[in-house]
């Protein structure tokens, strides 16, 4: 949710943001609702004071033996007008909130403007391990080796599900264990969140229309399967005042469940885009003045992780038309998929400023005598394991079908190759 002060004082900037994001939004209706709710709020306050004064006057008249007929009528008239003003205020407030909860976040000045991914900017590349000259696709190789079964998973659960088998299970668990050790050694608190989340918590972390077709709802219950631990961690401190101690750096580990409703025809083979996967997510609650440093820090840590694995990647700054609505700035890390001869997105690293914290009411203060402020929230993937498994299989395969295990994972897998 945007700071109301920004809406009132910088409507041109807000309009420019909507245009840059290609979002169809009735800004005039939001501003009108805001003006009406504030007008009727003030009117109701004034009438409340007048009614209270009239009530005291009636009481005084009774004590003095003065006729109270006119004063009582005036008090009743004021009560009726107050009731009408409060109704108008509530109506305008509802209209305002309905719109305010759907407007996207402001965009940082450093974000390139453009309609879609064609305006994204590649910032740098890291070469990593030499890739095979004639690689097999990860599904072909893993299925052929008996490490992956897509056919039986489709029979049991439908498309975009899979069975991991044998050493690929150990490699998946190795990615989880290494990720947690990696972040834990860098000051992150490990968190295993609930895998189900209420709608109000979900709406605090993400705009409703962006998750309705993405995540699974539990029928006849106010619960959703999480699409990422980010949402559960964002809501963890909802309706709280954090007393000092910022930043809070969390490393969330969880399965993730996604409908992938908009992915028809994309990545139909393999495990790059699936309905269920494990993910380790970074989430930070920061002071406003520190959030951009925290954003850079998260990206640096994530790059260090991929360099340690030896996976080739590039860092991409997303354009205004390609980034998520809650983010003010997003970097993607795209890893090289040797068999696809292409870079594919595996990491999204975003600064959401105070957009989520206003929705979730997460504030902080350093001293008890200070006013509270909204925290800034940041998030970044560290490892979505199904995508990393695909990257490792395609980039670390030998001609005989052997898959080399990246050095940091060998102690968890117990071997150098599978």
From Swiss-Prot:
Transmembrane parts of this sequence: none
InterPro entries: aa-tRNA-synt_IIb, aa-tRNA-synth_II, aa-tRNA-synth_II/BPL/LPL, Ser-tRNA-ligase_type_1, Ser-tRNA-synth_1_N, SerRS_1_N_sf, SerRS_core, tRNA-bd_arm
SUPFAM superfamilies linked: Class II aaRS and biotin synthetases, tRNA-binding arm
Example of a GO biological process term: seryl-tRNA aminoacylation
Keywords, ordered alphabetically: Aminoacyl-tRNA synthetase, ATP-binding, Cytoplasm, Ligase, Nucleotide-binding, Protein biosynthesis
Subcellular location, record wording: Cytoplasm
Catalysis performed (reactions): tRNA(Ser) + L-serine + ATP = L-seryl-tRNA(Ser) + AMP + diphosphate + H(+); tRNA(Sec) + L-serine + ATP = L-seryl-tRNA(Sec) + AMP + diphosphate + H(+)
Documented EC number(s): 6.1.1.11
Keyword Aminoacyl-tRNA synthetase: yes
Signal peptide: none
Top-level lineage group: Archaea
Any one GO molecular function term: ATP binding
Pfam families assigned: Seryl_tRNA_N, tRNA-synt_2b
GO cellular component, as recorded: cytoplasm
Pathway(s) where this gene product acts: Aminoacyl-tRNA biosynthesis; selenocysteinyl-tRNA(Sec) biosynthesis; L-seryl-tRNA(Sec) from L-serine and tRNA(Sec): step 1/1
Residues where ATP binds: 258-260, 274, 345-348
Broad class of enzyme this protein falls into: ligase
NCBIfam families: serS
Function: Catalyzes the attachment of serine to tRNA(Ser). Is also able to aminoacylate tRNA(Sec) with serine, to form the misacylated tRNA L-seryl-tRNA(Sec), which will be further converted into selenocysteinyl-tRNA(Sec).
UniProt note: domains: Consists of two distinct domains, a catalytic core and a N-terminal extension that is involved in tRNA binding.
Subunit note: Homodimer. The tRNA molecule binds across the dimer.
HAMAP family assigned: Ser_tRNA_synth_type1
UniProt similarity note: Belongs to the class-II aminoacyl-tRNA synthetase family. Type-1 seryl-tRNA synthetase subfamily.
Full protein name: Serine--tRNA ligase
Originating species: Cenarchaeum symbiosum (strain A)
Gene field: serS
């Amino acid at each position: 949710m945007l700071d109301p002060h920004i809406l009132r004082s910088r409507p041109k900037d807000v309009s420019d943001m909507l245009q840059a994001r290609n979002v169809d939004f009735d800004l005039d209706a939001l501003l009108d609702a805001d003006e009406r709710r504030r007008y009727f709020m003030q009117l109701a306050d004034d009438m409340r004071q007048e009614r209270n004064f009239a009530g005291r006057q009636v009481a005084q008249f009774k004590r003095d033996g003065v006729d109270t007929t006119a004063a009582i009528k005036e008090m009743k008239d004021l009560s009726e007008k107050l009731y009408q003003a409060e109704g108008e205020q509530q109506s305008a407030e509802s209209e305002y909130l309905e719109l305010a909860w759907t407007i996207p976040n402001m965009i940082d000045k450093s974000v390139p403007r453009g309609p879609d991914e064609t305006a994204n900017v590649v910032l740098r590349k890291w070469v990593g391990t030499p890739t095979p000259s004639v690689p097999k696709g990860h599904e072909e190789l893993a299925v052929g080796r008996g490490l992956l079964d897509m056919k039986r998973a489709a029979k049991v659960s439908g498309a975009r599900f899979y069975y991991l088998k044998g050493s690929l299970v150990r490699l998946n668990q190795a990615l989880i264990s290494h990720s947690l050790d990696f972040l834990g050694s860098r000051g992150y608190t490990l968190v295993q969140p609930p895998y189900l989340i209420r709608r109000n918590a979900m709406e605090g972390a993400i705009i409703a229309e962006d998750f309705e077709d993405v995540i699974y709802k539990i029928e006849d219950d106010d619960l959703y399967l999480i699409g990422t631990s980010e949402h559960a961690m964002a809501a963890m401190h909802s309706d709280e005042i954090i007393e000092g101690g910022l930043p809070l750096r969390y490393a969330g580990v969880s399965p993730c469940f996604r409908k992938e409703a908009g992915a028809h025809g994309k990545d139909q083979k393999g495990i790059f885009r699936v309905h269920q996967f494990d993910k380790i997510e970074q989430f930070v609650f920061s002071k406003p003045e520190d959030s951009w440093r925290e954003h850079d820090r998260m990206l640096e840590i994530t790059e260090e992780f991929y360099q340690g694995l030896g996976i080739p990647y590039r860092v991409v700054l997303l354009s205004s038309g390609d980034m998520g609505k809650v983010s003010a700035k997003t970097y993607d890390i795209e890893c090289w998929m040797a068999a696809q001869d292409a870079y594919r997105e595996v990491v999204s690293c975003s600064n959401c400023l105070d957009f989520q914290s206003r929705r979730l009411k997460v504030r902080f203060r350093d001293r008890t005598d200070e006013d509270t402020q909204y925290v800034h929230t940041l998030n970044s993937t560290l490892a979505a394991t199904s995508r990393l498994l695909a990257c490792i299989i395609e980039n670390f395969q030998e001609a005989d079908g052997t898959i080399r295990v990246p050095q940091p994972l060998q102690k968890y897998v117990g071997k150098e190759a599978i």
